[in-house]
């Protein structure tokens, strides 16, 4: 049973954005919200359940409690709410109220029990019913027990129950309303929870200012609808960090200057769009392979292999002779 109460409490404690939790009824005074639970439990379990209910909106931070009755209007409102759950609009089950003989001077929500409480009891202190107040009757007729708290047997708690008074004259409507009684706290009864009402929050306005997320003006935290910072992404002017909508650095380029890769101009690191070095060539000078003059490393204008003016040095003297003699010998040999 206690597990069931915990589940119910988790459901009713969800705020709805209104002034009362879900399925609670606001009192005519606007100060409280009530809900009747037609679950028969011990007084202690009913009290613990109500204490898990939280108020909605910006209501007081105190938790809920079993209902405390402090006026004839409130007494009748709670009764009508409970009676509305029956087919004949009369209470079918007695319901626990938020007081017990363990702390007789106060209701369980901390409000004084005297002089505004116990109005449903007869002033004689016999704990029997007292004819209830009805709408239109003067509130001054609400009996108040001016004495110190009674000293009934310990372990008792009040219940609200239906009352039917037979008309005194033919044609007079019966007096239907609540009366209270003291019963053993170990008895099983239904109960009524009360929680302070919060201020009604207009739809779509979350806590903060002007319907926006916490911050100013409907924007994300910061200023002016932007991401944190000023007007844009962090930094200045709607851009990425840095200046002017560009990547970090200056002028929309990659880090460095201009639109180029790091360095100067549009080239790779170095100068003039070429590979590292000068003039668009491979490392070296003049577009040639390393060395001078477009040739293989070495000197001369030919595409020969490394060496000086001929084939690479070879142990065969034939290959070290001038090309003209080599070609002549080739012609003679071939012929």
Curated annotation (Swiss-Prot):
Tissue: Embryo spicule.
Disulfide bonds: 50-193
The C-type lectin domain, residue ranges: 29-194
Top-level taxon: Eukaryota
UniProt-annotated location(s): Secreted
SUPFAM superfamilies: C-type lectin-like
Signal peptide: 1-17
Ranges annotated as biased composition (Low complexity): 311-323
A Gene Ontology term for the protein's cellular component: extracellular region
UniProt region (Disordered), positions on chain: 199-335
Biased composition (Gly residues): 207-310
Keywords, sorted A to Z: Disulfide bond, Repeat, Secreted, Signal
Membrane-spanning ranges: none
Tagged with keyword Ligase: no
InterPro entries from the UniProt entry: C-type_lectin-like, C-type_lectin-like/link_sf, CTDL_fold, SM50_spicule_matrix
Similarity remark: Belongs to the SM50 family.
Domain notes: The repetitive domain may provide a calcite binding matrix.
Role according to the record: Major matrix protein of the sea urchin embryo spicule which directs crystal growth in certain orientations and inhibit growth in others.
The name this protein goes by in its record: 34 kDa spicule matrix protein
């Amino acid at each position: 049973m206690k597990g069931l109460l915990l589940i119910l409490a988790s459901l009713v404690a969800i705020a709805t954005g209104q002034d009362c939790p879900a399925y609670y009824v606001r009192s005519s005074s606007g100060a409280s919200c009530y809900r009747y639970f037609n679950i028969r439990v011990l007084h202690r379990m009913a009290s613990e359940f109500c204490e898990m209910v939280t108020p909605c909106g910006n209501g007081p931070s105190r938790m809920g409690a079993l209902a405390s009755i402090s006026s004839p209007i409130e007494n009748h409102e709670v009764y009508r709410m409970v009676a509305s759950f029956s087919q004949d609009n009369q209470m079918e089950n007695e319901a626990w109220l938020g007081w017990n003989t363990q702390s007789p001077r106060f209701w369980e929500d901390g409000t004084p029990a005297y002089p505004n409480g116990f109005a449903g009891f007869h002033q004689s202190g016999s704990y029997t019913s007292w004819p209830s107040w009805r709408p239109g009757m003067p509130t001054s007729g609400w009996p108040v027990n001016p004495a110190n708290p009674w000293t009934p047997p310990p372990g008792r708690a009040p219940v609200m129950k239906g009352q039917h008074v037979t008309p005194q004259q033919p044609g007079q409507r019966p007096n239907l309303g609540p009366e209270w009684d003291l019963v053993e706290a170990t008895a099983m009864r239904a109960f009524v929870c009360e929680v302070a009402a919060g201020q009604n929050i207009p739809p779509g306005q979350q806590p903060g200012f002007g319907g926006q997320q916490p911050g100013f003006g409907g924007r994300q935290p910061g200023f002016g609808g932007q991401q944190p910072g000023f007007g844009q992404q962090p930094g200045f002017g709607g851009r990425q960090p840095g200046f002017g909508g560009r990547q970090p650095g200056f002028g929309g380029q990659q880090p460095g200057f201009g639109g180029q890769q790091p360095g100067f101009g549009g080239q790779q690191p170095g100068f003039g769009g070429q590979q590292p070095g000068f003039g668009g060539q491979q490392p070296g000078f003049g577009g040639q392979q390393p060395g001078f003059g477009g040739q293989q490393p070495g000197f001369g204008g030919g595409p020969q292999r490394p060496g000086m003016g001929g084939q690479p040095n070879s142990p065969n003297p034939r290959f070290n002779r001038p090309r003209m003699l080599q070609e002549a010998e080739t012609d003679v040999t071939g012929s």
